[in-house]
Amino acid sequence: LALLEWVKANLGRSIDLDHEYGSQCVDLVESYLTNFLRMPAWPGNAIDFSRGHYPGWVWVPNTPSNFPIAGDVVVWGGPNVEVGTTAFGHCAIALAASPNTLLVLSQNWPPGSPTLLKLMDYRAVLGWQHRRGG
């Protein structure tokens, strides 16, 4: 199953893997990791993904010369009133990126939303987890 096929199959769904706090952004990433990549889920909140060291992944800080690629897990810091993140941050799955924008599969942004495609800028993006060799 290719990434874009998995995205299409999950678009518009409300994914709540842990059955706590409703459909959170972390639930989407956990589903991506466990159901698509067949890897263990990462513990914690979205903001924790910027500090974690996961087998097979490398953290890439957000700088003007770095861009995520399809399949990277993008992490936003928080709280940030301008972009609407809380202290828990936000995470989403990168699908495409340019110097000014990135297209992601996101959930719970805006709060309560199901999975949706969202064109974002880089405000409050801390960086992304990138699969080694991916």
Regions found by a protein language model. Give the residues of each.
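Secreted/periplasmic proteins that engage bacterial cell-wall peptidoglycan
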Residues: 1-91, 96-98, 105
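Short loop/turn segments immediately following the C-termini of beta-strands
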Residues: 107-109
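Intrinsically disordered, low-complexity
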Residues: 1-19, 101, 111-134
